[in-house]
Amino acid sequence: MDAESVEPFLVYLPIPQRVVVLVLLGLWLWTWFLKVSVSYYDVSKVIVSNESTGLPYFNTSTKIHQSSLKLFKSISRVIIPWQLVCIILFQYSFTNNVSNKLLWFFLNVSPLLELFYIFAMILRSSAMVARCFKRILWVADIEPKPYRNNYIIISDTLTSYSKPLVDLAIYATFLFHDPTNVKCQVERYENAISLNIDVLVGVLPSLVRMIQSLREFTRGRSQKKDGSQLFNAFKYAGNIPIMLVTVYTRYYNLGPLGMMYWFMFWNSAYSFWWDVTMDWKLELFDFVNGDTSVNNNNSSNKADGLLRSILLYRKNAWYYSAMALDFILRFVWFWEYISGHSVFYGELNIFWLQILEIIRRWIWLFFKVEVEYIATTEGGKMDE
């Protein structure tokens, strides 16, 4: 294969290897989230862990952070050198047209083995995480509190990784078809796309969250709770029309692209409103609920009608910045559409957008977990 016909970025970071990078990024951001959050509240009241402190002067929240940091370091010590060796070998072999099939088999299968190692380490490190993953992937289950937040964090994180999962699925299809092919890591396998494997994999995380929301709606109705989870299910269902239009356009030269953009706009707008109003319980766009468990007393924050009465992170600017960033990142596709330009070109731009979505999810996590902590410690009823 001619190296000049491939984007330079793919030679430096092949598609499956960048999925590995994104997983490492997510683990690092999770560890950073814990480091920051434990300074403000006890995360262990929201996130259930099977860890025991072992030391009386360490609270459980600190122990969770230390365990996560230890896990991240253990994974990084193996994966980063492994990945660097594979990338250097790939660059040399690809640019010099090396045709050794055994070498290419090793290079092509390595990203899959790296990911297998990462997730094996994660699941082995925590029986609780393994339990949640098993129930999520098997029947899209979600247990009630105190385990509910574990399921939400994992499942919503998977939705932010939907596009990297698509890349992984296309690469894996190519790998199983021809594991010694030079193009396996730099080309999107046409057979996988023609079979719409990318669409099916891309919509799965949203389907899981939709089913979980419907389960909670059914559970809540029997307990005479509000029906907010039904509207949460609508949010995740918003991805389905986009996927259907994508499939349609593949079989017809002229598809309803205008309709797809309208679906995308509605989905981004509704998801942004849900993040701010329902997940973070901020009042800026709260046109539905006049009162919640985190907005049930008089304070300067509540009086301005923009935030809420209890703010654990203290500085109002952090909340306004989070709302602004969430809005920008939810609509990043729209800015590219109306401008006709992207920040980068081709696969590098795709990688950039995937990084931004993971960062958006990281920002979301701070305020979602904060709200759940307030609801738990204040003892008030909170809309789930």
From Swiss-Prot:
Top-level division of the source organism's lineage: Eukaryota
For the keyword Cytoplasm, the answer is no
Query: Listed GO cellular component terms?
Result: endoplasmic reticulum membrane
Record PROSITE patterns: EXS
Q: What does this protein do?
A: Required for the retention of luminal endoplasmic reticulum proteins, affects glycoprotein processing in the Golgi apparatus.
Q: Which membrane topology describes this protein? A: Multi-pass membrane protein
**PANTHER family reported for this sequence:** PROTEIN ERD1 HOMOLOG 2 (PTHR10783:SF46), XENOTROPIC AND POLYTROPIC RETROVIRUS RECEPTOR 1-RELATED (PTHR10783)
Where would you find this protein in the cell? Endoplasmic reticulum membrane
**Keyword terms, alphabetized:** Endoplasmic reticulum, Membrane, Protein transport, Transmembrane, Transmembrane helix, Transport
Q: Which InterPro entries match?
A: EXS_C
Question: What family is reported?
Answer: Belongs to the ERD1 family.
Tell me, what's a Pfam family for it? EXS
One GO biological process term is: protein transport
Q: What is this protein called?
A: Protein ERD1
Q: Where are the transmembrane segments?
A: 19-36, 78-94, 102-123
Please tell me the species this chain comes from: Kluyveromyces lactis (strain ATCC 8585 / CBS 2359 / DSM 70799 / NBRC 1267 / NRRL Y-1140 / WM37)
Chain ranges of the EXS domain: 189-384
